[in-house]
Amino acid sequence: MKTKYKKFKIDGLAQVYVEAKKLGYSRSYDSMCKRIRLMNMKPSIVKKSYPKSNWKAYKTTYPGEKVQIDIKYVPIESILFGPLDKRYYQITAIDEYTRKRVLSIVDEKSVTHTANFLETLEDEMGFKIKTVQTDNGREFVNESLEKESMFEIKLKELNIEYKRTRPYSPWQNGKVERSHRLDSEFYSRKKFLSYEEMIKSVKKNCSRYNNTARMVLEFKTPNMVLKEYKERVQYTKKSNKRDLFIFF
């Protein structure tokens, strides 16, 4: 178990548990976590504190019901090519139900790039999206909030509903925010010598995330959850002769 922890800890304890069970580990997940704490293998976690809010997250029931989107900086320390002042950004979309992610690297934090990101998002996710949720950044909405941005216009063209989080309330987009913490760990270990290397590495990181077991998914991967849902829908369609959902 110790060896599996060292190898897979970056993917989370759920993946450590799945890999350990493959070698015959018989203890429960909670028992494994306790053992890791006793071995001082897991660093203490400093919890963030937020102001009180009456907001409550609701549990989605199918892929595409709500997709969270956000954008983060690619650390300048990871970029060893091009002009020293050149910045890059990662646009992230995560489906709340399956936790499947789609990533894109752009060279500007702009509404043009986020709008373009939407054009292929449903194809890359593999299903129709009902709602997209973002914060109130200028890369998504106009500062005045009176005129629709390119991002909002593109959502309407795609027949996708749009929700914005309350200002200064990052926890309302918590799933994409938490996934960005994993990305920060990823970038902290990377030094890109070329743009092509960066794109290839980020694509590999996204694939690894979508194929890594998560405790919140009952030790399944995002792709496994999506596959199982599609199979249930196909079975229901054959039984009830009606469409419940649209997949690509």
Label the model's feature ranges.
Residues M1-P75, S149-I153, L226-V233:
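Basic, flexible linker segments flanking DNA-binding modules
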Residues D30, V46, V132, T165, ...:
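Residue-level detector of family-conserved "landmark" positions at structurally sensitive sites
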Residues A14, D30, T112, Y195-I199, ...:
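Residues in well-ordered alpha-helical elements
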Residues Q68-Q90, T98-K200, K204-R208:
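RNase H-like DDE/DDD metal-dependent nuclease/strand-transfer catalytic core used by mobile genetic elements
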Residues L158-I160, R181-F248:
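C-terminal domain-tail junction helix/linker
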